[in-house]
Amino acid sequence: KKNVGKMQKPAPDDLNNLLVYLRTKMTNQVKYDRNKDRQGLFKEDFFKTSYSENLQLLQEWIEESKSDSTIPSDALPQQLYLTMLTEYTAGFPIEEIKKRMNQIVYYCKQCLDIHRQYGQKEDIMFIWGPEEWAGEEQPNIIGLCLLFERMDWLETIKDSLNPYNDDEMYYDPSFRALMNMAIPTKFDPSAKFAKGGHNFRKPLLQAIMAESKEESLKYLNTYLSGWYEGNRKIGNLLIDTHLNQDPEYGGYIGYWSFESAAVAYLKDLDDTSLRQYLYYPKDMIDWARA
């Protein structure tokens, strides 16, 4: 269920900087360079139209949060995530992706404050959706926190996954194991994955838990080889969206497994074999290692 509440007024400098950034992006004609496209799947017209509309929507919601208007409290982090993925896919510099992540975490904190003030335990707000329904958002957000080495961000994301620190709440063991690589996170590595095909993430968990680099690399290759079809099996609506890039209906933002890169980064793996996969974010791990 979506929890609705009043956004607390953001710090003026943070808000004004974001608004200036959005207005600049919208004022200047949106440009697309296929040579920078990290997957090479965007159609130019679709990208320009969808990205401009996303920026316009963000500006409207940011303006609403500046006032005391009531908006869905999880709307901004989700929309910022979609915009960030679009920007990464289109080839935006990593430093801009980092700024966007900072905005996502900022509004996650706002959401948590709203929920703790107005929410009820039986009406938990899921900014990223319950873990038994999780697509790629949760592991991607966790993975990006790790690749940017921002444990403060990760603490906020961890709180947003389980606002009440409820041990009885379902969790995906691979997500918790991923967070535990950097910050103490309670989880049971033998916990079952959700029904409906979510056990395609078992090799990710095995890669994290493996004692040797060779084993970790083997499991990551297995995970990535089944990543796309695994997401299809669980009903991830992003899958195959590149095939229908209609600005009115299409939803392609890119396909990425930042969690895989985070494991390779933290375990200092030779990721040469992982770079064959279109959705392995090699630019991101190269930036982290620089």
Segments from the language model and where they lie:
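Eukaryote-skewed repeat-based solenoidal scaffolds used as protein-protein interaction platforms
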Residues: 9-243, 252
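Alpha-helical oligomerization segments
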Residues: 214, 218, 224-290
